[in-house]
Amino acid sequence: MDWFAPIDMYCERTHHGIISEPINLATNMGFLIAAVIMWYRAQTIKACRILSIMLASIGIASALHHSFAQTWAALIDVLSIAVFVFTYLFLANRNFLGLSVKHSIIIMILFLPINFISSNYLLDFDFLGDSVGYI
């Protein structure tokens, strides 16, 4: 696998050089702004602090992806989002629903096949294009 191969998935891409998706790059600031706001508003809530760090990591990883648009950058973008989703799912089950650690982990594990099956089903809808991975 060529980790530095250019990726061209978005209509905004203007060239294969750095910062060739300026609008996508700019929208990543929203993640960083949300992370800072969340950090200061939830000073005593550890779960919110964890999620705010993860929001910032999504902003940074996505900015790298939309700046360089190479395989390595896409991987860290996807991984940062996946870690956030699983962490949020776990924390929501623990804090909102009051589930045990065991049950929260089981739900996280069950999320994998459900997500895989639903994503494969959505691949049949051609109009969704590369956006299927985000649904």
Segments (PLM) and residue ranges:
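Multi-pass alpha-helical transmembrane bundles in non-GPCR membrane proteins
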Residues: 1-135
